[in-house]
C-alpha cells in the first residue's frame, strides 16, 4: 500500500473513532477516480440508513467523476436521509481532503437539509 493511501486511512480511522465516541449518525463519503459514493450510517455503525452514488440509475447517464455529479449525489443522499428521519449527521470524509468533489457533495447535502 502506498504511503499516501496509508496516511489517508490513518486519518479516516482516527475520525471514525471520534465519531463513534460521540455516538452520532455519520455521512460517510468514498471517492474513486470515476465515481463518488455517500452513505448515512447509524450511530452504532451497524446499519446503513440511506445511500446514493453515481452508480444509481438516475445519475449514471451523465458524467460520473466530476463536481456536478458529486452535487447530485449530495442532494440525493440528503433527500433519502430526510425520508429515513435523519437530519443531524457528522461528516465523515474518509481521510480525503475537504476540496473539490468531497466539498461539493457536502455543500449539496447541506442545501438538501442535512445539518453537520
From Swiss-Prot:
Gene3D superfamilies per the UniProt record, alphabetical: 3.30.420.100
Gene Ontology BP terms: translation
First and last residue of the signal peptide: none
InterPro entries in the record: Ribosomal_uL18_bac-type, Ribosomal_uL18_bac/euk
GO molecular function: 5S rRNA binding; structural constituent of ribosome
Record's keyword terms, sorted: Ribonucleoprotein, Ribosomal protein, RNA-binding, rRNA-binding
Entries under Pfam families matching the protein: Ribosomal_L18p (PF00861)
A GO cellular component annotation in the UniProt record: cytosolic large ribosomal subunit
SUPFAM superfamilies: Translational machinery components (SSF53137)
Function according to Swiss-Prot or TrEMBL: This is one of the proteins that bind and probably mediate the attachment of the 5S RNA into the large ribosomal subunit, where it forms part of the central protuberance.
Family indicated by similarity: Belongs to the universal ribosomal protein uL18 family.
Assembly with partners or alone: Part of the 50S ribosomal subunit; part of the 5S rRNA/L5/L18/L25 subcomplex. Contacts the 5S and 23S rRNAs.
PANTHER family: 39S RIBOSOMAL PROTEIN L18, MITOCHONDRIAL, LARGE RIBOSOMAL SUBUNIT PROTEIN UL18M
Protein name: Large ribosomal subunit protein uL18
The organism of origin for this protein: Pseudomonas aeruginosa (strain ATCC 15692 / DSM 22644 / CIP 104116 / JCM 14847 / LMG 12228 / 1C / PRS 101 / PAO1)
Amino acid at each position: 500500500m502506498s504511503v499516501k493511501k496509508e496516511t489517508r486511512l490513518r486519518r479516516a480511522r482516527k475520525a471514525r473513532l471520534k465519531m463513534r465516541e460521540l455516538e452520532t449518525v455519520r455521512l460517510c463519503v468514498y471517492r474513486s477516480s470515476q465515481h463518488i459514493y455517500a452513505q448515512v450510517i447509524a450511530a452504532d455503525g451497524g446499519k446503513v440508513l440511506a445511500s446514493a452514488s453515481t452508480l444509481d440509475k438516475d445519475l449514471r447517464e451523465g458524467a460520473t467523476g466530476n463536481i456536478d455529479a458529486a452535487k447530485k449525489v449530495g442532494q440525493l443522499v440528503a433527500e433519502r436521509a430526510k425520508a429515513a428521519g435523519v437530519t443531524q449527521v457528522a461528516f465523515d470524509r474518509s481521510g480525503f481532503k475537504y476540496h473539490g468533489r468531497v466539498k461539493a457533495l457536502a455543500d449539496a447535502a447541506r442545501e438538501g437539509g442535512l445539518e453537520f
